Amino acid sequence: WFEQWLSDVHLRAFLKRLPDFDDLEAEEKAFAHAQAYPDVHSALAFLLRWPAPAEAAKLIVTRKADLDGNLYELMTPAAEALSARYPLAATLALRSMIDFTLESGKSGRYRHAARHLGECGALAPHIDDFADIGSHQTYTAELKRRHGKKHGFWSLVT
């Protein structure tokens, strides 16, 4: 069941039946399976429920292009759960929602997207290496270039 559906309930039951130390190896295999699971959002939800924040952060960073920012009910708690120890992953979750909102013209979500952009700004000083995603300043400049005419959004950005 676990491998097909990423059921944390089934995995916990399975791990309880294993001898000491075998459970750690099985848990590592489960995390590896989650990292490669076809549905990145199901994998992220599993890793957050477990909880395995380091694995969730790794998933977000390695599969950032697959994230659907429309899934705010997943991305918001992911960003919250990861912000303290994994600010890069939290930033990527927030950016996925900002990008979706602006690219889709979801003006009803502008308030949230502006707040998310502010959260990204607050996380930025805690990120040592932005890798290939661009700094907060670079990201904000790119947003202005692509979505500068969305005054409803920019009027909410502080």
What are these regions (language model features)?
Residues 1-158:
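Eukaryote-biased, non-catalytic alpha-solenoid scaffold regions
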